[in-house]
UniProtKB/Swiss-Prot annotation:
Its EC number is 4.2.1.17. GO terms for molecular function: enoyl-CoA hydratase activity; isomerase activity. The keyword Isomerase applies. It comes from Mycosarcoma maydis (Corn smut fungus). This is Enoyl-CoA isomerase/hydratase fer4. It catalyses: a (3S)-3-hydroxyacyl-CoA = a (2E)-enoyl-CoA + H2O; a 4-saturated-(3S)-3-hydroxyacyl-CoA = a (3E)-enoyl-CoA + H2O. The gene is fer4. Disruption phenotype: Impairs the production of ferrichrome A but does not affect the production of ferrichrome. Pathway: Siderophore biosynthesis.
Length: 274
């Protein structure tokens, strides 16, 4: 992290959550709006995280779960409209292409991802949350939605595609066509949010969910995520083939052998991600 970074990556401080990392948006004075600089900082954090996963170092914990959160009272207000007003049409197109790429990188992370929503998640901010595996919001959050149609545009970084896949086409149409802003409970009822945490912060609940995943074998978690994600929008027969393609490599893993040995020896397995 540099002094000017608008997003940073850090390990969880709890010993029980070794392997849990936080990707933090840090532009609270601008409601964590996505500027070009913030976008590039997030991309850099994602590159570092992927490197930690694919090229682990012995003196660093292997990333197991990512919590995506933000500093300040707002999760993310979407694109930086002040910056957008100064952009040419070509620059807007380039920005949207970069934003779509960034969200695809979040979605493609091989480890489970949790969006910790403690404040408004609007437009591109909600699109960012939808790219995560789970969305957890504090019960005090009162603004979750897509206001784009009221600004003369549409969600342009995956919102029109991910929202229908998560909440269904009709609900997504109503949400996007009307630009309705939901509170946390309404968003959960709609299926946009998976869990609502009491109070004004959901970080503790995110950490509890992450802790529930910690006993799982890292390679198995990655394979499960890949199988579910790749098979979600294909025919069942193709999905079953994808499931097997994700399952088969685990047969040769050291973690699978460790699990069998631990079961026989009546102890907890010690997984290494190998």
């Amino acid at each position: 992290m540099t002094a000017s970074a608008l997003a940073y990556l850090e390990p969880d401080s709890s010993a029980e959550l070794t392997g849990v990392y936080h990707l933090v948006l840090d532009r609270p004075e601008a409601r964590n709006a996505i500027s070009r600089s913030l976008l590039q900082d997030v991309l850099q954090c994602l590159q570092v995280l992927v490197c930690k996963i694919t090229q682990p170092k012995q003196d660093e914990p292997l990333p197991r779960v990512l919590i995506l959160r933000a500093n300040g009272p707002c999760f993310c207000a979407g694109a930086d409209l002040k910056e957008r007003r100064e952009m040419s049409e070509a620059e807007v197109i380039e920005f949207l292409q970069d934003l779509r790429h960034m969200l695809e990188q979040v979605e493609k992370l091989p480890i489970p991802t949790l969006a910790a929503i403690d404040g408004p998640a609007l437009g591109g901010g909600l699109e960012l949350a939808l790219a995560c595996d789970f969305r957890i919001a504090a019960e005090t959050v009162s603004k979750i939605g897509f206001p784009e149609v009221k600004l003369g545009i549409i969600p342009g970084a995956g919102g029109t595609q991910r929202a229908p896949r998560i909440i269904g086409m009709q609900r997504a149409k109503e949400l996007i066509y009307t630009g309705t802003q939901l509170n946390a409970t309404q968003a959960k009822d709609l299926g946009l949010i998976d869990h609502v945490a009491p109070g004004s912060t959901c970080l503790k609940l995110c950490q509890e969910l992450a802790q529930q995943m910690m006993p799982s074998a890292p390679l198995a978690l990655r394979a499960a995520k890949m199988a579910i994600s790749m098979g979600a929008n294909v025919e069942l027969a193709r999905g079953l083939d994808l499931e097997w393609a994700c399952y088969e490599p685990l047969l040769e893993s050291k973690d699978r052998r460790e699990a069998l040995d631990a079961f026989q020896q009546k102890r907890k397995p010690i997984f290494t991600g190998k």
